[in-house]
């Protein structure tokens, strides 16, 4: 019989995979027939993580028991102590409905188990009838029973019952996910149906709002909250504390997910042979029991999921159009055959990503890194005087970091040619965590922040004595966004501590936690880069499924040893996992609890882990420290190779670094947020515009950003159009207007009539932000002289033109746009006739070759708003002077 336990439902939502569900529903014999064994893929130490979750549950159960009156909470305990839990586990209660029949039910029931009615939904009933599904029993963590009339929405006929039952699911995670929300909704739906079947419908109703009891770094938070309400004289302090602690799950949202599972997915998967169930290997598969099996199958059949960043929906669209392998995708995109044309007619995203996907596919075939044609990145600088590399590893359950690493490469001012850079590297290990208390993390964060801030302060201090042209730049590199988010979470968690706030002041300005408004100047300076996103943008690598750090580093122009073999970044068994950029967090639990499962791999017994020697605690500590160091080295290698091999594609320009507070920090308090919001909005728009313009022209068109394929309309056809416009709009009589036909595939561009922040350039023009004089290779004074001779620069007020960007010279206004014509066309007028003619004369644009229109960004508002709000007045907040570090 097929088995459907509550873990299968929750994990199906986590992995979103039909094959996973089919394998979980299969019998052992069915799985064995395919050579699938979930136990083969278990990670050593994973039981510690499960035990930590159960321990947190048990602690919260005990909190509820200890703060409630005797007899108000029904529970049972096992007879023996569980060594991993450090206590007797709670035992399931099997007589739930007998308890509910009591004249006065308890306030809470812990781990009450009941059978899910087969008629929960018609689909589930059909699964039982047609496929012999095993009867399912579920066990919500806590049933909280309250007198009716709380105002909570109820499942059922809406009448107020004598009692309401609220489902509570205890989770160690501070931020519950979709799987948690669907799980608690499933419990609520199942219990509501079971209560009706038991004939309790008139007395009990189940709350439609299931709840999550989330994790907290203060293990006594609930007990303290109960005491607070007791001190306030609350009639029911326990219920008040629960109401404040719990996260409510909107039933109407997640009911749809649960019912769709039973009505559609479950039946569809049960009707499918195991080998035919749909699947797609991606980053979310990291902890799936069957991931190795699927990766092997993907390699055997050249599965489309081998392409990093291709999602399952896109892969299914490709397959529906006859493209089933990465090799076929390469052929289809390269030849632009009918299959690919059909795909891009259905998906603008695939149209935009086509060249990158084809490059990734070719790289897999050829086994070498390949650049994506035409792409550039405005997210990473080609050079910085100081480069800081950061890696952070954490436990996603508790949210606590267990390893932080920072390294720097610094070229000081005044160094001589050939002088080596200053290098430094620091590793910080959180070696003790008791009951989710982040105190040790706080101490390591203070050490980490002190080191990185001192590196930044050193450059900033040097720059105060240098002229602008000689000031040193500084930039911070992370591998992926997870590390940045974790850094911000640590700041958020500890910033109220007086010992921490001054130490992290500089870093929070550049990487503010969610509760702080970003500093606009720091934000605009783009202080850091997510290197993985740069690789995604620029390079195809021979790495399947996802660009993990080590796989990327080992395939991206690796260093070569003296014997000619490539150097590999590698870690011992247990310190790295496929498709993950984090040190396995089981190692942290082993270190924190002194219960070590990981063993040294033994070449003499490669398939018998029982003969491998366990790590000692010191060896484990050193192993985590070494793993953190290797992560830093791999990150540095990738950045170095990007700069060596693709320097011309890295277009972010960095100015001299300053750690000084921005002027916005001295603005009156009432105006500060308004000014910051406006400046942040402007900075976001400017960066988005610059990043999009760094894409190849076909991608810009596919994102509806640009109008491409512009060619001058024959004069005989253009003249009547121009005459009609000038007749209807006399203000254009003295102007020179141009009429261009453009590509029909650009009809849906967001550029509209009346837009005047638009530049026209040849399709091979790469950088509209480059000053025209630098492009022509002339200095400021020579450029000024040339403009003076042309009558373009007549006074000091015109000197801005000397340093104008190419985009400014090529700025035009859209006078008319006829996108729906059989041959679409656009009519434009120069923004500045003199500058435009100057650009034509100096071959900055050739109207005889194919052209493209790109939106520009100019900030017209932030300066005015800043001035107006400063004029309103008010006292600025006092500036705290950071004390000197020793």
Go through each PLM region and give its residues:
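Metal-dependent nuclease catalytic cores that hydrolyze phosphodiester bonds in DNA/RNA
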Residues: 1-157
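A non-catalytic, helix-rich entry segment at domain boundaries
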Residues: 33-106, 331-376, 674-703
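Accessory interdomain/linker segments of ATP-dependent helicases and helicase-like nucleic-acid enzymes
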Residues: 12, 28, 33-74, 638-779
């Amino acid at each position: 019989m097929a088995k459907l336990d509550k873990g299968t439902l929750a994990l199906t939502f986590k992995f979103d995979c039909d094959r996973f569900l089919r394998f979980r529903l299969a019998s052992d014999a069915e799985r064995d027939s395919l050579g699938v064994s979930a136990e083969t893929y278990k990670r050593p130490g994973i039981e510690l993580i499960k035990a930590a979750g159960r321990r947190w549950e048990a602690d919260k159960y005990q909190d509820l028991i200890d703060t409630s009156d005797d007899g108000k909470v029904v529970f049972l305990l096992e007879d023996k102590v569980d060594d991993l839990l450090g206590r007797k586990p709670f035992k399931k209660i099997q007589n739930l409905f007998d308890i509910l029949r009591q004249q006065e039910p308890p306030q809470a029931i812990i781990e009450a188990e009941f059978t899910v009615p087969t008629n929960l939904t018609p689909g589930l009933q059909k699964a039982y009838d047609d496929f012999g599904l095993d009867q399912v029993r579920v066990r919500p963590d806590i049933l909280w029973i309250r007198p009716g009339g709380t105002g909570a929405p109820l499942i059922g006929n809406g009448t107020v019952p004598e009692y309401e039952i609220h489902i509570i699911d205890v989770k160690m995670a501070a931020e519950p996910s979709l799987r948690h929300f669907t799980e608690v909704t499933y419990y609520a739906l199942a219990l509501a149906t079971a209560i009706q079947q038991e004939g309790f419908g008139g007395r009990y109703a189940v709350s439609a709002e299931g709840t999550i009891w989330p994790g907290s770094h203060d293990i006594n938070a609930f007990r303290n909250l109960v005491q607070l309400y007791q001190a306030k004289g609350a009639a029911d302090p326990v219920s008040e504390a629960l109401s404040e602690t719990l996260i409510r799950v909107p039933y109407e949202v997640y009911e749809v997910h649960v019912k769709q599972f039973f009505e559609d997915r479950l039946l569809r998967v049960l009707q499918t042979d195991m080998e035919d169930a749909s699947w797609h290997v991606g980053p979310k598969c990291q902890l799936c029991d069957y991931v190795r099996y699927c990766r092997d199958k993907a390699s055997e059949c050249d599965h489309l999921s081998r392409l990093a960043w291709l999602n399952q929906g896109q892969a299914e669209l490709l397959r529906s159009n006859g493209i089933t392998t990465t090799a076929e995708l390469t052929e289809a995109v390269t030849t632009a055959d009918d299959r690919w044309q059909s795909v891009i007619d259905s998906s603008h995203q695939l149209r935009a990503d086509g060249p990158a996907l084809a490059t990734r596919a070719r790289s897999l075939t050829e086994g070498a890194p390949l650049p994506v044609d035409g792409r550039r990145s405005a997210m990473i600088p080609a050079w910085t005087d100081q480069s800081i590399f950061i890696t952070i590893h954490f436990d996603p359950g508790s949210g606590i970091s267990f390893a932080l690493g920072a390294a720097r490469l610094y070229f000081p001012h005044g160094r001589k040619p050939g002088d080596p850079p200053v290098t430094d590297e620091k590793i910080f290990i959180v070696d003790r965590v008791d009951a989710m208390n982040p105190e040790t993390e706080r101490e390591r964060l203070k050490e980490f922040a002190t080191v990185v801030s001192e590196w930044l302060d050193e450059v900033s201090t040097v720059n105060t004595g240098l002229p602008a042209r000689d000031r040193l730049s500084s930039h911070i590199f992370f591998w992926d966004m997870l590390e940045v988010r974790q850094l911000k979470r640590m700041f958020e968690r500890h910033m109220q501590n007086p010992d921490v706030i001054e130490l992290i002041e500089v870093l929070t300005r550049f990487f503010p936690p969610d509760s702080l408004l970003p500093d606009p100047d720091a934000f605009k300076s783009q202080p850091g880069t997510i290197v993985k996103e740069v690789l995604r943008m620029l390079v195809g690598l021979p790495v399947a499924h996802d660009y993990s750090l080590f796989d990327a580093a080992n395939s991206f122009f690796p260093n070569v040893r003296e014997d000619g073999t490539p150097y590999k970044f590698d870690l011992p068994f247990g310190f790295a996992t496929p498709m993950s950029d984090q040190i396995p967090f089981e190692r942290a639990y082993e270190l924190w609890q002194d219960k070590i499962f990981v063993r040294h791999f033994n070449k003499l017994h490669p398939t018998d882990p029982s003969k491998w020697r366990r790590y000692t605690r010191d060896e484990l500590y050193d192993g985590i420290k070494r793993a953190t160091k290797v992560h830093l080295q791999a990150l540095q290698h990738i950045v170095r190779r990007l700069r060596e091999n693709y320097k011309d594609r890295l277009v972010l320009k960095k100015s001299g670094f300053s750690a000084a507070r921005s002027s916005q920090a001295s603005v009156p308090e009432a105006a500060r947020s308004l000014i910051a919001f406006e400046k942040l909005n402007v900075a976001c728009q400017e960066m988005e515009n610059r990043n999009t313009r760094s894409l190849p022209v076909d991608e810009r068109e596919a994102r509806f950003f640009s109008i491409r394929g512009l060619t001058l309309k024959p004069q005989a056809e253009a003249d009547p159009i121009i005459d009609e416009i000038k007749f209807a709009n006399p203000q254009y009589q003295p102007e020179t207007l141009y009429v261009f036909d453009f590509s029909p595939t650009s009809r849906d561009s967001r550029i509209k009539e009346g837009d005047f922040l638009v530049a026209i350039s040849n399709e091979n023009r790469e950088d509209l932000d480059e000053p025209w004089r630098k492009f022509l290779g002339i200095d400021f004074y020579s450029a000024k002289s040339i403009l003076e001779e042309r009558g373009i620069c007549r006074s000091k007020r015109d000197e801005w033109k000397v340093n104008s960007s190419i985009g400014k010279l090529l700025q035009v206004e859209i006078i008319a746009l006829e996108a729906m014509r059989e041959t679409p066309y656009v009519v434009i007028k120069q923004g500045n006739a003199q500058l435009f003619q100057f650009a034509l004369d100096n071959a900055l644009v050739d109207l005889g070759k194919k052209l493209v229109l790109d939106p520009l960004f100019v900030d017209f508002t932030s300066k005015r708003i800043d001035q107006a709000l400063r004029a309103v007045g008010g006292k600025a907040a006092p500036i705290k002077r950071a004390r000197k570090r020793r």
